[in-house]
């Protein structure tokens, strides 16, 4: 009898795929320490080996694009530290490791600590560019924190003596390797800040292995460099060696000698610059003096040309020339004025106003006579037209018509009577005659019939 709910049934392929996804997603990337065995490298360039310890082993693969970054040749039995992803090879169901990076076991553990501390300090902002202090230019005093017996101090002092022998140097001796080295380096940095004798610090040592340089990967040293009020130049190992101190320092120099180059002035270069400036100054002075001499010569020549005696002679000559021109111009002007006077006299005689006045008076008398005659004729004609108009008006005047026996009758409202239908019995009428007005009352109204005209047939 079957149960009420059947369990999930996996195919082999689905099972291997599910396990692979669980391993990749849940485990992610891990660090593994172990011993190499069964190392092989086929023609593809990939590495295949087993990583084991005393009680267990696991198959590993490192592909060509990853193993080309490994700086050593893995050997059978070698202890290594690998960074890898856990997965499952589905066709065979084999659980295996895909290696991304590999280091010898001792250096590998240190490198892992290095990466962890680097990530931590970077997250806190100790590497940010905004906190980097500017180095003094030029430096007036240099502090060196390193071993008093190491090659790094010798290199630094040699470069400073060659480049800037007058630059003061204060040495803060300290161990640079061993368990006590980080604490001594921190105390030296703090002492330099307390004494405040120098304006830049060089912190470093010569080259060595990762273990030899490990003091400069110490968190205490990194925080002391970051807290320093004096700018710090890190100079640890060779150019390929990069420590935590290099990230925190205000400037990283690839070597101690390079750090000395950075903080010092090149006296020989300064001397060459001074000599070059002196040459430019001499050339400028020569040019200036030559220019002033040429200017003096020009001014002297102009001064000679403008000597008072020469100027007086030129002005005297100019005065005589102007005097001659003025005399000649005056004579010509007087001559032209005389000729003009003669022409005007002749014109005045020809245009004497007496004759013109006589002719004008005669003309005025003639015009006055003609005007009087014209006015008399127009007045006579006007009187005649006025008399005719008066006679005509009297002929057509209503008063003249009334004087001939006619009358005009009007009703009480002033309307002229033209027909009997306008009059009513008992109504008062006003009749105007030639010599007065008659007021009458209507006693009867009789309408006269009009006679019809007979029309004869043609």
Curated annotation (Swiss-Prot):
Catalytic activity: Exonucleolytic cleavage in either 5'- to 3'- or 3'- to 5'-direction to yield nucleoside 5'-phosphates
Listed InterPro entries: Exonuc_VII_L, Exonuc_VII_lsu_C, OB-fold_nuc-bd_dom
Keyword Zinc assigned: no
Signal peptide: none
Alphabetically ordered keywords of this record: Cytoplasm, Exonuclease, Hydrolase, Nuclease
Principal subcellular localization: cytoplasm
Transmembrane segments: none
Location(s) in or outside the cell: Cytoplasm
One Gene Ontology term from the biological process aspect of the record: DNA catabolic process
Single GO molecular function: nucleic acid binding
EC identifiers of the protein: 3.1.11.6
GO cellular component, one term: exodeoxyribonuclease VII complex
Pfam name, any one: Exonuc_VII_L
Quaternary structure and interacting proteins, as annotated: Heterooligomer composed of large and small subunits.
HAMAP family for the chain: Exonuc_7_L
Protein family membership: Belongs to the XseA family.
NCBIfam families on file: xseA
Role: Bidirectionally degrades single-stranded DNA into large acid-insoluble oligonucleotides, which are then degraded further into small acid-soluble oligonucleotides.
Name of the featured protein: Exodeoxyribonuclease 7 large subunit
Source organism of the structure: Escherichia coli O6:K15:H31 (strain 536 / UPEC)
């Amino acid at each position: 009898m079957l149960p009420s709910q059947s369990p999930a049934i996996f195919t082999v392929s689905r099972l291997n795929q599910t396990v692979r996804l669980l391993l990749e997603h849940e485990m992610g990337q891990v660090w593994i320490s172990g011993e190499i065995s069964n190392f092989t490298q086929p023609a593809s360039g990939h590495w295949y080996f087993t990583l084991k310890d005393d009680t267990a082993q696991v198959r590993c693969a490192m592909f060509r694009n990853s193993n080309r970054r490994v700086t050593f040749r893995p050997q059978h039995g070698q202890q290594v530290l690998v960074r890898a992803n856990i997965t499952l090879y589905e066709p065979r169901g084999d659980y295996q490791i895909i290696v991304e990076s590999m280091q010898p076991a001792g250096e590998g553990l240190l490198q892992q600590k290095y990466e962890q501390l680097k990530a931590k300090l970077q997250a806190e902002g100790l590497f940010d560019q905004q906190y980097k202090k500017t180095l003094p230019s030029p430096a007036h005093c240099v502090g060196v924190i390193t071993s008093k017996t190491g090659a790094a101090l010798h290199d630094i002092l040699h470069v400073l003596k060659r480049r800037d022998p007058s630059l003061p140097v204060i040495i803060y001796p300290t161990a640079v390797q061993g368990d006590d080295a980080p604490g001594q380096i921190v105390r030296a940095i703090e002492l330099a800040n307390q004494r405040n004798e120098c304006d830049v610090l060089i912190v470093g040592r010569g080259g060595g292995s990762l273990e030899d340089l490990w003091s400069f990967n110490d968190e205490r040293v990194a925080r002391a460099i970051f807290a320093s009020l004096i700018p710090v130049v890190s100079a640890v190992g060779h150019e390929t060696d990069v420590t935590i101190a290099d990230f925190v320092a205000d400037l990283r120099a690839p070597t101690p000698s390079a750090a000395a180059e950075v903080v010092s002035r090149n006296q020989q270069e300064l001397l060459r610059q001074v000599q070059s400036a002196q040459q430019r100054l001499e050339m400028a002075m020569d040019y200036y003096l030559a220019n002033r001499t040429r200017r003096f010569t020009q001014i002297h020549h102009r001064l000679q040309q403008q000597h008072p005696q020469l100027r007086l002679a030129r002005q005297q000559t100019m005065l005589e020339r102007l005097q001659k021109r003025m005399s000649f111009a005056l004579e010509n002007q007087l001559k032209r004025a005389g000729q003009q006077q003669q022409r005007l006299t002749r014109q005045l005689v020809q245009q004497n106003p007496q004759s013109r006045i006589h002719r004008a008076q005669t003309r005025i008398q003639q015009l006055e006579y003609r005007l009087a005659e014209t006015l008399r004729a127009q007045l006579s004609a006007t009187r005649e037209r006025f008399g005719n108009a008066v006679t005509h008006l009297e002929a057509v005047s209503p008063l003249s018509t009334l004087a001939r026996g006619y009358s005009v009758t009007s009703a009480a409202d002033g309307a002229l009577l033209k027909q009997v239908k306008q009059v009513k019995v008992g109504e008062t009428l006003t009749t105007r005659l030639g010599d007065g007005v008659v007021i009458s009352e209507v006693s009867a109204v009789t309408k006269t019939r009009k006679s019809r005209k007979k029309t004869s047939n043609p």
